[in-house]
């Protein structure tokens, strides 16, 4: 592996002041920046009534404001060079809110709203957006999910443990980006919930009240 082809920069998504220096470092090293993949985030497993406000705020700071700050740091370079692509890994809950994920769902909805607006604003400047909506992928996201007091859940959800292989998910993501897709759903049967919500919102709401999503 040629070390000159890689640059590793640690970045705290809650440190907004670190975004511009990080973007400048990358631009100085490579001369340009073609894509930014927003994939950092934390999930949640707690009821609204039990969750500390500090937990709600932390989830929004990491999942939403972190992505916004990094986007604003990179956007001027995209415009100067005539374009670039933001790849935004959100979640099915960005369109399908589910119990025990209220702040997490809110953060993903916020990402959808922000990047759909950005897509329209900067289209003529060559800026493109790919929204990625994964379902149950076999990663550590549920293990590290925040509980009501801000501690980690510490265990993997059953549906996560039986979810899609992350390598397969990554390949589908790369394929979607290469094809210039505006949005891609990477999910198993849980993806059917999107169609149910569109065709029969009332039925979807009845179903989600009874389904145990773990």
Positions of predicted regions on the chain:
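Substrate-binding pocket helix/loop in short-chain dehydrogenase/reductase
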Residues: 47-48, 55-57
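The beta1-alpha1 cofactor-binding region of Rossmann-like NAD(H)/NADP(H)-dependent oxidoreductases
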Residues: 11-21, 53
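Active-site loop immediately N-terminal to the catalytic Tyr-X3-Lys motif
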Residues: 49, 96-103
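Residue(s) in the substrate-gating loop at a strand-loop-helix junction
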Residues: 91
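Active-site-adjacent segment of SDR/Rossmann-fold oxidoreductases
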Residues: 96, 117-128
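Active-site helix of classical SDR
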Residues: 71, 107
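SDR active-site lid
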Residues: 124-188
């Amino acid at each position: 592996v040629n070390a000159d082809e890689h640059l590793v920069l640690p970045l705290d998504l809650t440190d907004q002041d670190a975004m511009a220096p990080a973007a400048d470092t990358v631009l100085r090293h490579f001369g340009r920046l073609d894509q930014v993949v927003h994939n950092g985030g934390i999930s949640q497993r707690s009821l609204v009534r039990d969750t500390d406000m500090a937990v709600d705020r932390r989830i929004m700071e990491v999942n939403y404001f972190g992505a916004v700050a990094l986007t604003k740091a990179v956007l001027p370079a995209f415009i100067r060079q005539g374009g670039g692509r933001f790849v935004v890994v959100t979640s099915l809950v960005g369109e399908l809110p589910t119990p025990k994920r209220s702040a997490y769902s809110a953060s993903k909805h916020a990402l959808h709203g922000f990047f759909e607006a950005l897509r329209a604003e900067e289209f003529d400047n060559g800026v493109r957006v790919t929204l990625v909506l994964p379902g149950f992928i076999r990663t550590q996201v549920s293990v590290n999910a925040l509980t009501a007091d801000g501690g980690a859940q510490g265990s993997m959800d059953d549906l996560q443990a039986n979810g899609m292989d992350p390598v397969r998910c990554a390949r589908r993501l790369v394929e979607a980006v290469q094809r210039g897709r505006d949005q891609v759903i990477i999910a198993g049967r849980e993806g059917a919930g999107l169609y149910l919500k569109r065709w029969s919102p009332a039925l979807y709401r009845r179903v989600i009240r009874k389904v145990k999503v773990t």
